[in-house]
Amino acid sequence: MCIRDRLLTQYHLQRQVIGVKGEVILLENNDLALTETLFMTNGCYIVPKQPNRFLIGATSEFNNYSVGTTDEGMDWLLRHAYHRVPQLKDSHILKKWSGVRPYTEKEMPVMDQIDDGLYVISGHYRNGILLSPIIGRDIANWLLSGIKPSRYSSFTVTRGNIHEMYH
């Protein structure tokens, strides 16, 4: 058992955070002048990066911790990207990669102190990269001051265990 699993068991956090594998692809197209980010309701997005480069993401496979990309994942991304922006079909693939994102029930992260000097900051799922600057600043202030930011009061490890009703 790895240290992560021991900590999760010791602090009763097993059900809190699971991994969701996401695959992305970076394309280059010198003839496309797309400047706006496109988000689709199925989870696919197209993000213009450096001039003529476009990040296409992301697949979501729950409880999948495998390494690398799959043909199925790449096909899904390209099919949806091409449907929205047909000019992307003429692009060159620069890079493909995958990673595992921490997911929590209701997509609500955990940001809590679980023991003296031990904090859990996880579960930001698809928004982690976007929120990391402000979360990092807030957590640094919390560690230095010893005062948890009040806006994080709902993000406890015990939520769902107390004071909540489910229908």
Predicted ranges, named:
Residues 87, 91-167:
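C-terminal catalytic lobe of FAD-dependent flavoproteins
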Residues 4-116:
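Active-site substrate-recognition segment that forms the wall
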